[in-house]
């Protein structure tokens, strides 16, 4: 199984949207059983919060399922657990 983690500052906008879009693409290709996809934050600011309403609205507008999600912070263990950890911008990469 390929394990992918998307990371942004708060885990309520970009990384969450990317997680849901990528999951939708994987599911559409019939590859759901080959991937584990998640997202996380570099900061603690939004821990426990749901996706931002703007993110949810845009996903629904595009017909992409909004999955159950609460913001989490990435950990050192994630480097061992995931095959790919993808930061959403240069600042995120520095903070990872």
Identify the role of each PLM range.
Residues 1-81:
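Conserved active-site segments centered on acidic
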Residues 89:
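Glycine-rich, N-terminal phosphate-binding loop of Rossmann-like dinucleotide-binding domains
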Residues 92-93:
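Alpha-helix capping/helix-boundary segments
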Residues 96:
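Helix-loop-beta element that forms the nucleotide-linked donor phosphate-binding surface
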């Amino acid at each position: 199984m390929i394990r992918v983690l998307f990371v942004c500052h708060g885990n309520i906008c970009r990384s969450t949207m990317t997680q849901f879009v990528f999951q939708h693409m994987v599911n559409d290709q019939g590859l759901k059983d080959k991937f584990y996809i998640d997202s996380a934050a570099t900061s603690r600011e939004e821990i426990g919060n749901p996706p931002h309403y703007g993110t949810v609205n845009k996903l629904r507008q595009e017909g992409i399922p909004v999955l159950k999600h609460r913001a989490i912070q990435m950990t050192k263990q994630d480097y061992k657990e995931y095959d790919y950890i993808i930061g959403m911008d240069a600042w995120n990469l520095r903070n990872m």
